[in-house]
Structure formats: C-alpha cells, structure tokens
C-alpha cells in the first residue's frame, strides 16, 4: 500500500460558481428525517406509521438527551419508518399533504425550552464534535458563523 503525505493541505481546483436563482414554491411530495443527521440518536417514537402530523409536531425524542425533540417540518401522514440492522433508525418518511397545518406550541418563557419545542434546538452544534448539545447544558461561548467560505457555497447576499 502506498502512503501519501500532504503538507499544507490540498488545493482542489474548482471552477465556476453557483447559479444565482432561487426556486420558488418547491414542495416535495415526501420529506425524510434521516438519523445520520443526529449522531448518537437513540429514538423514542412519539408517533407511528400512518399517523397524521402537523408542522412542528414532535415525532421523535432522544432517549440519551432527555427532552430533545425532532419535529415534523411539514404536515401530512407518516408514510414509513425505515430501520436497519438491530432495528436502528434509518429514516422517517412523511407524505406531504401541502396544507401546512400548524401544531400549537405553548410558550413557557424559557428560551432553551421554547427553542426545543419549536424544533430549533438541533440548529445548535457543540464543539469539537459537531453534535447537538445536551438540553440541560449551558454554553460558555456561542459562535455565530454568518458567512461560509466553502467552495461553491451559495452567496449569502442572494438569500438576504
């Protein structure tokens, strides 16, 4: 086996740029919630296959991070729950009914709890392993990345 050592990184020559347009009214027929987006997730299902869900309704709760909820991004019917080896969760598919009926939230006044109930807690990432933080943890610092510099990244001025 040949060993390759790189010093100073690798410069990949990428040419071109991202097209500057926004697709309006893109509503797919099926939405998937993938377990690979949540490292270490031990899911507890709050709904089952065939259940009707609304936007913001909790679908899964993490057993290891008590209280962390994953909510439905669309309204519709849970069409399938896909499992792999040892019944590990692979994905949850939701058939979009395109009605976008909302799940009613109770605002408690606690910012962390309200973010979790709204399904926004998974937007936070804990360093250095890029995991969803524990619900009860209090951060020492918060880093806000307002502009990514990855190759072929979308221009933030177009979005704003």
Listing of model-derived features with the role each one plays in the protein:
Residues 37-41, 53-56, 65-80:
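Generic structural motif
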Residues 82-160:
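Buried, small/hydrophobic-residue-enriched core segments of structured protein domains
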Residues 55-63, 98-101:
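Glycine-/proline-rich flexible loop or hinge segments
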Residues 24-27, 77-82:
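Short, solvent-exposed cationic patches
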Residues 47-53, 82-85:
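Acidic, glycine-anchored pre-beta loop/turn
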Residues 62-73, 87-90, 102:
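Short, Lys/Arg- and Gly-enriched loop/turn segments at beta-strand edges
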